Amino acid sequence: MKQLTTYLPLLFLLLLGACKNAKTGSAAQLSDDALMDTVQRRTFNYFWEGAEPNSGLAPERIHMDGIYPEKDQNVITSGGSGFGIMAILSGIDRNYITREEGLARMEKIVSFLEKADRFHGAYPHWWYGDTGKVKPFGQKDNGGDLVETAFLIQGLLAVHQYYVNGSPQEQALAKRIDTLWRDVDWNFYRQGNQNVLYWHWSPEYGWAMDFPVHGYNECLIMYLLAAASPTHGVPASVYHEGWAQN
């Protein structure tokens, strides 16, 4: 039931298709397992086959005709890549690719992230995948994006747990991921030790975006990771006052 609820929008579309074909009696019957496999495989394919070549990370957009009027075919997204990383783990576990192929891709990703632009440990929303330099998301949004960083870090931590007790090569990768996780300075993004986390910081414009993040919305993971950080953990008051607004 939990799986079915998770993929309810897709199921709704499938049911619409079934209703449309009801007159011909050709409606396809999908079991819960078959539905799950279809969603996982197609999600995996997007992030595996569509990855930006140099970084292994997720492009901000893919134009199926190969035409990019804005010349942005190499622009990659940090938060979307966090979800893509977890999709690749699913692909390994479901034998869509070998464990060795998955590890090679993860090593490419981590090698890129170790060298790519970061801002007090936090990643920007976009990079140029061929250089690792920040691609501004907006005029004053050319630095750290703490929400997108959280989406990326949660994916990396899933990889860490997948490999931490594996082969020596896998354990070495898990250790490198742990360093990236520990480098994120969540406390810095409190802007002067306020009891709230700020979404953006720019080395050029500072706190000009001025976006304190309050609940409740999709940004909860940012507060959870900030509280859990072994190196830059925030006090409970940041969660209670900033997120829950108690």
Regions found by a protein language model. Give the residues of each.
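Bacterial N-terminal signal peptides that target proteins for export
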Residues: M1-L8
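C-terminal motif of bacterial Sec signal peptides marking the signal peptidase cleavage site
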Residues: L15-A18
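Low-complexity, Ser/Thr/Pro/Gly-enriched N-terminal "stalk/linker" regions
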Residues: K23-I76, H120-A122, W127, A227
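Well-ordered alpha-helical scaffold segments within catalytic/enzyme domains
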Residues: A27-L35, N45-Y46, G82-I97, F112, ...
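Extended ligand-binding clefts on enzyme/binding-domain cores
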Residues: D33-L35, G121-T149, N165-N246
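Aromatic- and histidine-enriched alpha-helix N-cap/loop-to-helix transition segments
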Residues: V39, V75-M86, G144-Q154, P212-N217
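Active-site-adjacent structural elements in enzyme catalytic domains
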Residues: R42, E100-K115, Q139, D145, ...
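Membrane helical hairpin/interfacial module
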Residues: Q73-G82, M86-N142
